[in-house]
């Protein structure tokens, strides 16, 4: 049985990897072996950080809500508990946006939370 070298397949695979490595520094964008390692590592980082991004944004929203809540005389946990008791179903992203862009509306939410905590 004759030997099959697989030239076109190999070339396509290498071309695909080098295309993904476009913009990398040094040998990482030019040499297949190094580029392949870096592309695999980059894809792992991308997969991990797509999940990390969700956690990072949640943390950021909580920090912003906490800062605004303390200006209104509440802690973050008491504000969120008060809103839950009031039956207000707005997520942290929206509450954080109100805290940054519309302090008056956030103050109304804080007052609502305070009122429901004292019941």
Curated annotation (Swiss-Prot):
InterPro entries according to UniProt: Ribosomal_bL20 (IPR005813), RIBOSOMAL_L20_CS (IPR049946), Ribosomal_protein_bL20_C (IPR035566)
GO biological process, one term: translation
Keyword Metal-binding among record annotations: no
Key word Protein biosynthesis present: no
Gene giving rise to this polypeptide: rplT
SUPFAM superfamilies: Ribosomal protein L20
Annotated GO CC locations: ribonucleoprotein complex; ribosome
Name of the featured protein: Large ribosomal subunit protein bL20
Cysteine-cysteine disulfides: none
Role noted for this protein: Binds directly to 23S ribosomal RNA and is necessary for the in vitro assembly process of the 50S ribosomal subunit. It is not involved in the protein synthesizing functions of that subunit.
Keywords for this protein: Ribonucleoprotein, Ribosomal protein, RNA-binding, rRNA-binding
């Amino acid at each position: 049985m004759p030997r099959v070298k697989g030239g076109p397949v190999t070339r396509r695979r290498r071309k695909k990897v080098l295309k993904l490595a476009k913009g990398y520094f040094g040998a990482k964008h030019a040499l297949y072996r190094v580029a392949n390692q870096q592309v695999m590592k980059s894809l792992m980082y991308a997969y991990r950080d797509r999940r990390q991004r969700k956690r990072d944004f949640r943390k950021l929203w909580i920090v912003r809500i906490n800062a605004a809540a303390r200006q209104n005389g509440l802690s973050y946990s008491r504000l969120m508990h008060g809103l839950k008791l009031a039956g207000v179903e707005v997520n942290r992203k929206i509450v954080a946006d109100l805290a940054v862009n519309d302090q008056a509306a956030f103050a109304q939410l804080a007052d609502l939370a305070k009122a429901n905590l004292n019941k």
